[in-house]
Amino acid sequence: MPAALKCQRWTSSSSTTFFPVALNSPDAVEQALREIVAACDVTLLDLRVYPFEPIGVTGVAVVAESHVNIHTWPEYGYAAVDIFTCGGREDPSAAIPTLRECFAPERIETMEMTRGILLDEMVGVAAGDG
């Protein structure tokens, strides 16, 4: 069953000078994506990182099992991380220690979702069974 983990709303009080710098660093976002891919045991196909002006970074890792993306808003001490997998053996929550190590957030809020719940119904309709 496809799985997704969304991590949002990061703040940092103990490392206020480091944290926004990491969130605005294309190199830090790229390294985090590479480490997340390794931690989740997925197959990297492509990785792109885009810095924004005047501030912020978006990075996406396209993996054989789906994708991982990071969007940062350093001015708010905020990052949104989405990890989507569809292979079944992957564990998106394995990325949490990596995120803590790469960005040192004070708090990480997560939401786990299951995707593809309606797949059987949609396949049945597409095949003329519905």
Q: Which positions does each model-derived feature cover?
A:
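Polybasic/polar functional segments that serve as interface/processing modules
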Residues: M1-G130
